Structure formats: C-alpha cells, structure tokens
C-alpha cells in the first residue's frame, strides 16, 4: 500500500500538544526544529504546507509557573495569550534556519461561520501559500468560550483543509493510528491501514478520551477525517513519534491509518454550510421529508416539519433532524424560529394566510441545504 501523501500537493499538517512540548512543561524546541526541517523537505519537493499546531497553553503554563492545567476559562485564556508569543517565536526561529518565512494565524469559529470572514481567511491563506510562506494556525484560545470553541485542533485542521481545498490532512499524534479496538485493553487489536473516511464502523472503533494536555481523542480524529472529506481531502492519522514521519509519508511509505475521501466534493458554498459547528436551532422533520431531502434532492417545506427547537433568525444555519433524532441535513432557513412554529405542518399555500406575508415557499431551499 502506497501513502496517499506522495501524490498530494497541498497539505494541512496538525501536530498535537504532546509532540511539541516537554510532557506539557513548555515547548520542546528540538522537536519543533525537527518538524520545521521535515516541512522544509516537503517544501523542497514542491508541496504546499499549512501547519496547525497546539502548544500555546502548555507554553503559557510553563512561563507562568503553573504545573497543572487550570480549569477556569479566564486562566486558560491568559495562559494561551502568554504561550502564543513563545510558540510563534520558536517556529519562526526554526523555520528561518531553512530560509522559510512563517505567518501566525489565530482563528475562532466565528471567523469561519461568517461568510465574509471565511472568504477573507481563505484569501489570506492562499496568498501566503503563493508567497512561499508557511502559515501556522491555532485556535484563538484567548477570546473563545466553550460555546464557540472548535473543540480541538483536529477539527480545526479539517476546517482549514476544507478552507484551502487541501489534498490531504495529516493528523500527527502520540498513537500509531486507528486500531480495531483499544490496544491497551485488547491484545487482538490491529491497526487499520486504510478505510473510507466517514465509514460508520470507524466511530465505534475510536472510543476513548484524549490526554490531559490536549482535548482530542481518536474519535475527534475520525470525525475530522469525515469533515475533511467534504472538500475531497484524504486524511492520514499517524504517530508523530515515528522518525521523519512526514518525509517518509511524502516518499510513499504507508504509516498509520489513511482514510480516503470517497464522497463527491461539495460545492464551496455547501461545504461552508456543512462546516458550521454551531447550528442555531433544529427542526424535526417527518419520514417523508427525510426521504425527499436525502433521496430526492428536494427543498424542505414547512409541511414536513414536526417540531421546532431553539431560537434562530432568518438566514441562520439550522439542522434538520429525522424522527429517530439523527441529523440528516442543515441549511440556511428562510424563516425565524417564531415564524416556523406558526407555519410548520402547513402547506406552503397557507404561509401568507398564517403570517400575513410569504418570504419564500420553502423553509430551506435545496440550493441552501446540504446533507450531513
């Protein structure tokens, strides 16, 4: 089996906290130097690389003299602010040794949820790549709250892959890849060499939580691969403890687990909608509506809505949930939650009678709806 990275030109590389820190006690300068050297080697092969790196909070804890990760959000944000300075400095220093310029980009979900800011971020990243700069991306932990967190840098890496239409996402961790079961508990567990991104059985294999330093377990990596597949990006989950892992992957060596994007590439606008992590509300739809959306490619009409949950405004992203509670689609709503509560279960011809006006005959037009 040949590594999919060999034939990939535009890469997003995500490096976890444990691979850039000294067991959480500040940054490991030597390790960061090795990552810079490997990325420089990939660049010399003509590959474009965007780096998503953890480590800011761990570095901030070290600089502030804290031995345990704080629980209070304001202290975490303070640690991130202090540590981000060191993280950027070390990366800049190490890449300069190879004649490569770096750029620091801090993102929040709000940056990508707003269409204009999303396009601006995309334009900036593509310009940096064109200029031969290596963008180094992290979540802007200083300003985010639990409500608007990406949740982990695996998810952020997938969103960046979609944003720049990357060919592949490489998630480097302290694990060898995805196993059929937890190898610490099951001696018969075997490494999954290759599978389809988004295959339902993968999520069952990937139970478990992450380390105390980071937030992402194997499940977040599997879900990130599924999300990256929206733009056609393949994913490799591999151990960052492997010597020269990036160089070897680029040479075609199969390391870890590679998850192939088999689904059709989404149109850019629909991909943006699918990548919304926080939807503003939910509508429960009947089985007939589920069938029309998933098999017929139809719009969602008010008559197919059973229940309305949450508060949302016109133009916001809402999720469509089937009778079994499973999300089947999401899209931009033509009506607010208050309006939807009045017109649900009604044929479109009665919208004007109920509301006194009709904005659109559909609750969500098929052009503004994406299956998930």
From Swiss-Prot:
Origin: domain of life: Bacteria
InterPro entries: AceGlu_kinase-like_sf, Asp/Glu/Uridylate_kinase, G5K_ProB, Glu/AcGlu_kinase, Glu_5kinase, Glu_5kinase/COase_Synthase, Glutamate_5-kinase_CS, PUA
Molecular functions (GO terms): ATP binding; glutamate 5-kinase activity; RNA binding
A Pfam cross-reference name: AA_kinase
Family the entry assigns: Belongs to the glutamate 5-kinase family.
UniProt-listed HAMAP family: ProB (MF_00456)
Protein name (Swiss-Prot/TrEMBL): Glutamate 5-kinase
Organism expressing this protein natively: Burkholderia orbicola (strain MC0-3)
